[in-house]
Amino acid sequence: MPIVKRKPTSAGRRFVVNVVNADLHKGAPHAPLLEKKSKSGGRNNNGRITTRHIGGGHKQHYRVIDFRRNKDGIPAKVERLEYDPNRTAYIALVCYADGERRYIIAPKGVKAGDVIQSGDAAPIKPGNALPLRNIPVGSVVHCIEMKPGKGAQIARSAGTSVQLVAREGQYCTLRLRSGEMRKILSECRATLGEVSNSEHNLRSLGKAGASRWRGVRPTVRGVAMNPVDHPHGGGEGRTSGGRHPVSPWGTPTKGYKTRSNKRTDKMIVRRRNKK
């Protein structure tokens, strides 16, 4: 997939860098696998902002993705690759031998016409989904379940992958891209290979409006606000904020640890790498 830097025919095009994939389907998505997607503007049922920097953006349909990959023993042919506005990875429309169609996260290297499969007896090749106990140690996988049958939760973004480094008893040890080592039940499923669109991080939106198309609103610094809006607000002229960096609600930020999920700490063998 080539990286295309646009000619600066206008100020808004000057810094645009796009990832162009000629293999993507140019028509409409598969209608039976679409669902309505309404926008919240970051508000809850009381109308209050619960998530900042959300609002506007282009209308979208949600593509129903098969994260469980539980149609075992039935081969499926990849009909086409598609763009999905709801995620960074590409998606693949697959047609099973019994005629059912499903969307899956497109693995890197999988193209139209390829045949994929899921289940214990599936061959070891990119795009096939198997329980971790059937995958060779050292393999690169993505779309990994954290609970058997729940559906993939780990490594679903563009270009991501996880390495299976060990198998002991009923658990497998995985090395995540962050450097974290984590135990997962061997019954959980994973898809072989890495996620498509690995050059996604090289793109440049080029202008503020491109973020607005995606429903992302501006981020305002606390020191630019009034005291009523932020702990760093107020003061005459430019100020430093007057205290250690905090969120609008007073919680320390920039490295302050907030994770308190002790229940799953025992599954983490090694913490992620420090930035």
UniProtKB/Swiss-Prot annotation:
Residues 28-54, 223-275 are annotated as: Disordered. One of its GO terms (cellular component) is large ribosomal subunit. It comes from the Bacteria. It holds the Pfam family Ribosomal_L2. InterPro entries: NA-bd_OB-fold, Rib_uL2_dom2, Ribosomal_uL2, Ribosomal_uL2_bac/org-type, Ribosomal_uL2_C, Ribosomal_uL2_CS, Ribosomal_uL2_dom3, Ribosomal_uL2_RNA-bd_dom. GO terms for biological process: cytoplasmic translation. GO terms for molecular function: rRNA binding; structural constituent of ribosome; transferase activity. The keyword Electron transport does not apply. Keywords: Ribonucleoprotein, Ribosomal protein, RNA-binding, rRNA-binding. Signal peptide: none annotated. The keyword RNA-binding applies. Belongs to the universal ribosomal protein uL2 family. Part of the 50S ribosomal subunit. Forms a bridge to the 30S subunit in the 70S ribosome. One of the primary rRNA binding proteins. Required for association of the 30S and 50S subunits to form the 70S ribosome, for tRNA binding and peptide bond formation. It has been suggested to have peptidyltransferase activity; this is somewhat controversial. Makes several contacts with the 16S rRNA in the 70S ribosome. This is Large ribosomal subunit protein uL2. It comes from Saccharophagus degradans (strain 2-40 / ATCC 43961 / DSM 17024). The gene is rplB.
